[in-house]
Amino acid sequence: MSDALDEGLVQRIDARGTIEWSETCYRYTGAHRDALSGEGARRFGGRWNPPLLFPAIYLADSAQACMVEVERAAQAASTTAEKMLEAAYRLHTIDVTDLAVLDLTTPQAREAVGLENDDIYGDDWSGCQAVGHAAWFLHMQGVLVPAAGGVGLVVTAYEQRTRPGQLQLRQSVDLTPALYQELRAT
């Protein structure tokens, strides 16, 4: 992914504008990671942020959607969620308040910015990263999208764009294999 922006894409995203979004969200991290840091995504990149450009905090709109993301991470590491969670992980409950996000929850919204379902659910992140980069460039605070795992929504909050108090850590608990199974079943 190049650091260059596609001007046409920037204009299409700017024309869509943002919505204010508030929700209780969930995120899992390694036990010693900061729940409200997007540094890992900055270093390695994520679906909605290219590597080495800006930090992004990935949040699921339900505990079940978060557990699907745990499954996806385990599959990418060629293991099971239960085996992966034998290491120390934490599940964080985070309150999101009035985050100005690019809403890509409808097929029409995604089409308007040049994304297809394969971009959302597939393994090639380049289209999503280009959209995320443009949204960040426009000082949007994040993007709201269907979760790649097919359950719920994900909001990617751009850490440098959020204001104090917009992301509030409510609770952190150990994410054990037993808790994973309980939450995945709901």
UniProtKB/Swiss-Prot annotation:
Effect of residue 27 to E: No longer toxic, does not degrade NAD(+)
Reactions this protein catalyses: phosphate + NAD(+) = ADP-alpha-D-ribose 1''-phosphate + nicotinamide + H(+)
Effect of residue 27 to A: No longer toxic
Any one GO molecular-function label of the UniProt entry: nucleotidyltransferase activity
UniProt keyword Nucleotidyltransferase, yes or no: yes
Subunit structure: Heterotetramer with 2 subunits each of MbcT and MbcA; the tetramers further assemble into trimers with 3-fold symmetry. The antitoxin acts by blocking acces to the toxin active site.
UniProt protein name: NAD(+) phosphorylase MbcT
Organism: Mycobacterium tuberculosis (strain ATCC 25618 / H37Rv)
